[in-house]
């Protein structure tokens, strides 16, 4: 395992729920630690079509514009994934924007049990004032240094999206360090603002105590976690944690 490389992964798929859905394209871009300790994008990055073994639905074609003819004759996921997820020389971690999605398809068996960095969760911590935390909003809100506009297009294709994510990851690694990003990624997302309902868009510190405590019982894991952290900030203790469904598509 190389302690000097994190591989950013982006997948385009036939849907969001394997095994009913499958991968039709994988893109990657490495971020490498230099001799001076700074992290920078590696020169190499690429993408490969993947045969999903089923037709691509029109609703997902409309997102990434990958058609059945594009993937016909490509390698199957189980055959192509290990070499990309476990590159020669190793990687200290894999990364993705909303990594929970990629992890549905990049199973521990395929990735060799790789650790993951979620650049979405890390963005919530490092750039809480961003108007949104999607890969593309962060791209234009932050305007990362060195990002080649043409290489980052079209959106919703595997290499361009991985390339954009890698610029966020580079800046996150240089700001907070590898261990911190891994720790943040292992926790639910720390949302800076309420994502829905009557308080949508308000920062947690703007809410009264009763409202904040109410959100600690929310159905969404990220909302509960964020409200609990605000309670801890105010009172020094955490409310009893509940259980509920995993993170939804927020912010």
Which residues make up each language-model segment?
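Metal-dependent phosphoesterase core characteristic of DEDDh/y 3'-5' exonuclease domains
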Residues: 2-8, 19-66, 85-202, 210, ...
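Conserved Rossmann-like nucleotide-cofactor binding loop
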Residues: 14
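Glycine-rich, highly charged phosphate/nucleotide-binding loops
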Residues: 70-80
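Generic structural signal for hydrophobic core residues of well-folded globular domains
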Residues: 126, 172, 215-219, 234
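Short, surface-exposed, low-complexity cationic segments
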Residues: 206-229
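Charged, low-complexity intrinsically disordered segments and flexible loops
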Residues: 225-227, 231-244
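Short linear clamp-binding motif
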Residues: 245-251
